[in-house]
Design a protein with these regions (language model features):
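Short acidic (Asp/Glu) and glycine-rich catalytic loops that position anionic groups and cofactors
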Residues: 27-30, 118-119
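Intrinsically disordered, low-complexity polar/acidic regions
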Residues: 7-8, 36-217
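Membrane-proximal amphipathic alpha-helices
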Residues: 2-28, 35-43
Length: 217
């Protein structure tokens, strides 16, 4: 029966899922490598590279580049984005009513500078993810470890509050290489590439071939 068949395929399914997760980590690491190769990646270059990854799987929600920005650098980055045609670009946070409001001044920010797909996600540009404790914790874990970190979270922007998202954070450091000490990693940290995925869709893609008609996940 289908249960026995599914049990027999359990190890195979696990290996497939592990391989897919490694592919996701490789993709977000590739975004980081893009910024290693050049000190300045344009919005168009980011779009072209991300598009090649987005075409591969429907469960990829988005790719983002999120730089570490000091207070003294805020105005320049906002002006740069506005000159690129994003006339309403400015650093934002979520209000208690879950609407975007201007981010207050502080020592440093982690704004979403680039995001693909652009359409449908453009309202997230400029959002300071460090204003959300869960996301700031992921940034700090990636920064301090020098490795990709991942976590499941609800959609913070109410696009689909019932769907869990999986976020992969890949850190980037000045000089391109990962510093050997935590202190150096904190000092040379430049930002993170982020991949947002719907892993439940990926799991469904693996499991559905073994379900008999009328059985739904």
């Amino acid at each position: 029966d289908w249960i026995q068949q599914f049990e027999q395929e359990g190890i195979k399914n696990t290996l497939i899922l592990q391989k897919e997760i490694e592919n996701l980590k490789r993709d977000v690491r590739g975004i980081t490598s893009l910024f290693k190769l050049s000190k300045k990646i344009t919005r168009s270059e980011f779009k072209t590279y991300a598009a090649s990854l987005l075409d591969k799987n429907h469960f990829i929600r988005s790719f983002q580049w999120i730089p570490r920005i000091k207070q003294s650098e805020r105005s320049a980055l906002e002006s740069q984005a506005q000159k690129e045609g994003l006339v309403n670009f400015h650093f934002t946070i979520l209000s208690e009513e879950s609407t975007f409001i201007t981010a207050p001044n502080k020592r440093e920010y982690f704004p979403i500078q680039y995001i693909e797909p652009f359409f449908g996600n453009d309202s997230l540009l400029g959002f300071d993810i460090s204003s959300q404790p869960t996301l700031l914790n992921l940034v700090n874990r990636a920064r301090d470890s020098g490795k990709i970190v991942a976590a499941n979270t609800k959609d913070l922007f109410n696009q689909d509050p019932n769907r869990m998202l999986t976020l992969f954070f890949s850190p980037l450091y000045k000089g391109g290489e990962t510093p050997k000490t935590t202190e150096a990693r904190k000092r040379l940290f430049m930002g993170v590439a982020v991949g947002t995925y719907q892993l439940n869709d990926m799991i469904r893609q693996v499991i559905e071939p073994y379900l008999i008609p009328g059985i739904f996940l």
